[in-house]
Amino acid sequence: VRGKARLSDEEASRYCVEYGDVLFQRSSENQEDAGTSNVYLDQHVSSAFGGFVIRGKKVGEYNPLFIKYLLGSSSIREQITHRAQGAQHINVSQDTLADVALMMPSMREQEAAGLVFLHLDNLITLHQRKLNLLKNTKKSLLNKMFV
């Protein structure tokens, strides 16, 4: 929660999340959610992460937006979930994540693909809002007509 917690300088440097860092869910109750990821895309504000998350620091050249979509793809998710271990709680380790093979196109292609997927997500969100508005309008009209 932004602005609601304080960290020592040592904690802040150890748990700091910056633009381009990748965050992986360490543990899950089901196989499908094990190792789900997100990429920190705020370029202006750093944040902190907790103990149930594995942070991958941005060390090489990659487009963070592209990585966000790549890590959510079915082929990468399959690699991660296939390697996850556990019975009651399914866990993913840093070693597991290090073994995931990523096919990285050129930076130019990464930037283009990331923007295409972002645009598609924005269109989906816009149409979902319109759909919800139409459903609510229909419901309201039905309620008024058949009182």
Where are these regions (language model features)?
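Feature detects amphipathic, helix-rich regulatory segments
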Residues: 1-147
